[in-house]
Amino acid sequence: MRRRVLLILATMGLEVLLLGGVALADTIDGTSGPDDLVGTDQEDVIHASGGADYVSGLAGPDVLYAGAGNDTVVGREGNDSIYGNTGSDTLFGNESNDTINSAGDGVKDVVKCGIGKNDTAYVDKIDWVKENCENVFLLVRSGGA
């Protein structure tokens, strides 16, 4: 009975928070499976983990990290920083001036900066970069001994 009451009170508190229209900045961590991770209208930090994840920052200058799976990461509004990871990721900057880094994993990623006027992408030679990225830097690895 006590557990049920606590659950009801927690649900009521969440409803009050949502009805108040308050969106607080957040740090969100994914699980080892596939996740849909969506931020707030404030500045968020979102870390995907394992699985094929979907990450969206919404408004605000967000920092978004793809995880180990084949992830889709969407910046939305705000000057976002987006980082790919192992796996074949699809990274979208969307609105504002974004920085996207898919370099260093050696796996083909798709990078689309968006409608900002000063987007920057750091990529590998194998990555597919859409034409809307204004500043593109190619990671070149030197040969080892």
Regions found by a protein language model. Name each.
Residues M1-L9:
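Bacterial N-terminal signal peptides that target proteins for export
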